[in-house]
Amino acid sequence: MNAPAEQADDVCTLPLVRRMAALLDRDPASFADGDLLPRGWHVALFNPPTRQSELRADGAAHLGVTLPDLGLPRLMMGGRRIEFVSDIPIGARVRRTSRAGAVTHKSGRSGRFALVDVEHRINLHDNATPVVIETNSYILREADGGQPAAESMTAPAAIPPADAIQILVPDETMLFRYSAITDNPHRIHYDLAYAQTEGYPTLVVNGTVPTMFLLEMFRAHVGGEPAGWRGRNLAPILCGAPLTLTLGREGDEWTMRAHGPRGEVALEARAWQ
């Protein structure tokens, strides 16, 4: 797939930053114009104003690039890689250039699916040098039969010791606020009846939500900001189910995980400075 690059412009506004701070239980008043945006919070920017008539059947909006219609209506993010080259000042005008990579078709136990990477390069409006380079990996799947997913029958897994541990219970208000901040209309995050048609027993937590809290753990326990992040979503994270967030050092990197209620790893990431 050799689709042309697509560009979008935005402004890193103070009210938007303060709403993200409130979601993460930080003091919104501690942020002011000219401060540096905490790394990772750029996810609140560049949410394309997709026309209602152009939303996918699952509610998913434009991803920053135009993807071909592959006949695969279910969308999920498989992972993301981020290089933080520099920082975005609050109040700055920013531009994002997005490109889609090749589409890889595969098949497995769940049927036919496709993988596609979308690369985003963000720069300040008066400087062509990127401040953030991000690659998001998406999985497109066939429609589900509509039967609720069965609970895992695997034995509970022990959560290994870590330098920092935090319990997070994503609830409906957290999902609503995150979707509002990021203008995310993907229905599995707020429409229970629709989520069940995709085989989920309840609402699905956007994988970026625990990512944001893991980045907060990194700042609190490591000190300073990360230079890079590499994460994989390994299992659905369900609304109301407790997550155990862990952080531990491994060599020059820090490993972070979100463990589900049975100890299973739902999200795994590495960050470095």
Mark where each language-model region is.
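A contiguous, surface-exposed recognition patch within enzymatic or periplasmic domains that forms
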Residues: M1-L36, E151-P210, M217-A220
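Surface-exposed loop/turn and secondary-structure junction residues enriched for glycine/proline
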Residues: P15, D27, G40, A44-P49, ...
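Flexible, active-site-adjacent loop/turn segments at secondary-structure boundaries
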Residues: W41-A44, P73-L75, I82, F113, ...
